[in-house]
Design a protein with these regions (language model features):
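Residues forming anionic-ligand binding surfaces in small-molecule and nucleic-acid pockets
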Residues: 110-117, 229-241, 311-313, 384-395
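Glycine-/small-residue-rich beta-strand-loop submotif within the FAD-binding core of flavoenzymes
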Residues: 44-53, 94-129, 171, 235
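Short, conserved charged micro-motifs
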Residues: 65-68, 132, 252-259, 326-335, ...
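Conserved glycine-rich FAD pyrophosphate-binding loop
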Residues: 2-9, 14-17, 25, 40, ...
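Short cationic amphipathic helices and targeting signals
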Residues: 3-6, 55-60, 122-124, 245-248, ...
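FAD-binding subdomain of flavoenzyme oxidoreductases
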Residues: 112-115, 124-268, 532
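Generic secondary-structure signature for well-ordered alpha-helical cores
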Residues: 17-25, 75-78, 138-142, 184-191, ...
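C-terminal cap/substrate-recognition region of VAO/PCMH-type FAD-linked oxidoreductases
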Residues: 216, 232-233, 243-254, 258-372
Length: 532
């Protein structure tokens, strides 16, 4: 049996026995076979000495059991790594950041505690997936939508806590911002409720997120301060109609004005859905060979624009979506065309009003997430789609960039040059993604292989890219465990004041440093002292 670093076999055996007395022997896992699912399937350290491996896993069923487990762990100083469903592919999966930690697997806590149709909210546990929530709403015949990411098998709570995003209305697709009220078990086993939940018998816990005094929910986003056992979310009242339209512009430089138009529409709530930008000339696009005569990303702009004109292709397009009453979405699409017509040569297509709910035949071949319907269709993109037993995964570089056309051009030029120079095995470079208001994120997916030598080179290049992007003002919002310290190192304003603040809070709330050590680059005092 593996043991955490610094813990004797006798003490660990005593803790395991105590865990078994709380959750039942069948829900404590220590064998290699049982711990295999808690390895990161996409780990760039897989089968290397540095791979992050759990020493055990415990699967509680209730908040009371979580409290008891945390008291035991705190007493024995056992490192604990909470997960919701462990589907965080590309960002660590179910594996701990600190090797030897005991994974606290919350997937058995899969209860939907309340769905309120009149006030459009839900209260649920961390084991509830987007599929679970969608089915519950459909089974009850409720007039509500969810906003879901790709893919839909993950935890609603887990995705929000890692700052995930979706596709529908701007008020809901920032999943952490759409939460309202959190229940947290602290390292000592104490139970905390945030916002109005701190008031016994509160009637508005899922309706007012701020409550009284400082807003502390953000301390549990991408955090190592507690174990979230309940979370409320605002849901989207099902819209009556939907419109999707496409705006195209002919010149590369037109992206500047196009983004400005879209920003205005979003910031005035004249458009609700996530804007999807695209260009046939972006590098490292989705799988599929481009025409042999098509200019590449680094071809002269004049050649690109001439090719686009000759083939009746816009240089840039943005797909826009609208949700609401039929007459409202029609007016919003007309308004979009009026605003975008100021760009010379702008073209428009689509714009048909579609009555909701969507018919099954309409969903075929479409991104179902646009309609709050979870799916696994994302796995039809890339290497895993063609192999039932794939041998590679990916890590993702996820820089946040300005929501301007100039920001798009500068960031893509930098990423293209950097990945080429570092010979990073890019599989997909996403278009600028606008799931959050005010910024874009770009997803740079880098292949992970079974070859340790290749993975070692990739790790070195990935770290260099993190540093270069940061030097140009682009910070990562999320990363795999192997690079969490590297990303935190870039957030260095005023001699790393942010990290030092995180450490101060960590040492106060979790003095024994047992929860998620190293997560997002925040280490407890006893490990920091060893590293010094």
């Amino acid at each position: 049996m593996r043991t955490p670093a610094g813990i004797s076999e006798a003490d660990f055996a005593a803790a395991i026995a105590a865990f078994e007395s709380v959750v039942g022997k069948e829900w404590v896992f220590t064998s290699d076979d049982d711990l295999e699912p808690y390895r990161d399937a996409y780990s760039i350290l897989r089968d290397e000495p540095e791979e992050r491996i759990a020493s055990a896993a415990v699967a509680p069923f209730t908040s009371d059991e979580v409290q008891a487990v945390m008291r035991i762990a705190n007493e024995h100083r056992i490192p604990i790594y909470p997960i919701s469903t462990g589907k965080n592919l590309g960002y660590g999966g179910a594996a701990p950041v600190l090797s030897g930690s005991v994974v606290l697997d919350l997937k058995r806590m899969n209860r939907i505690l309340e769905i309120d149709e009149r006030n459009s909210y839900v209260l649920l546990e961390p084991g509830v997936s987007y599929f679970d929530l969608y089915r519950a709403i459909q089974d009850k015949g409720l007039n509500l939508w969810i906003d879901c990411p790709d893919p839909g098998w993950g935890s609603v709570v887990g995705n929000a806590l890692d700052y995930g995003g979706g596709y529908t209305h701007s008020w809901y697709r920032n999943h952490f911002e759409a939460h309202c009220g959190t229940e947290v078990v602290l390292a000592n086993g104490e139970l905390l409720r945030t916002g109005m939940g701190a008031l016994p018998g509160a009637k508005t816990w899922q309706q007012n997120k701020y409550g009284y005094g400082p807003f502390v929910d953000g301390l549990f986003k991408q955090s190592s301060l507690g174990v979230v056992t309940k979370m409320g979310f605002w849901l989207y009242p099902a819209p009556e109609a939907y419109i999707s339209g496409v705006v195209g512009v002919p010149k590369k430089a037109d992206i500047n004005a196009l983004v400005d138009v879209i920003n205005y529409l979003e910031n005035t709530v004249s458009m609700q859905g996530m804007p999807v930008f695209a260009s046939p000339f972006l590098p490292f696009g989705l799988p599929g060979a481009p025409p042999p005569d098509m200019p590449t990303y680094d071809s002269p702009v004049a050649e690109q624009e001439a090719y686009a004109a000759a083939h009746n292709l816009p240089y840039w397009t943005v797909t826009v979506s609208y949700y609401g009453a039929p007459e409202v979405v029609k007016a919003q699409w007309d308004y979009t065309k009026r605003k975008a017509s100021a760009i010379a040569g702008a073209t428009f297509s689509g714009g048909d009003v579609v009555t909701m709910p969507p018919k099954p035949e309409m969903l075929k071949g479409m991104n179902r997430s646009l309609f709050g319907v979870p799916s696994l269709s994302i796995f039809f993109i890339g290497a895993r789609s063609e192999h039932s037993d794939p041998t590679q995964g990916h890590i993702t570089c996820s820089p946040i960039i300005p929501r301007t056309g100039e920001g798009i051009s500068e960031a893509y030029d930098l990423i293209f040059r950097t990945t080429k120079r570092l010979e990073l095995p890019v599989t997909i470079l996403s278009p600028p993604i606008g799931c959050w208001a005010r910024t874009f994120v770009i997803l740079v997916m880098i292949a992970v292989t079974e070859d340790p030598a290749k993975n070692k080179r990739t790790r070195a290049g990935f770290r260099e890219m993190i540093r270069i992007l940061a030097e140009h003002g682009y910070g990562e919002y999320r990363t795999a465990p192997a690079f969490m310290d590297d990303v935190m190192e870039t957030y260095s304003f005023n001699n790393h004041a942010l990290r030092r603040f995180h450490e101060t809070v960590k040492d106060a709330v979790d003095p024994n440093g047992i929860i998620s050590a190293g997560r997002y680059g925040v280490w407890p005092k006893h490990i920091r002292e060893k590293k010094a």
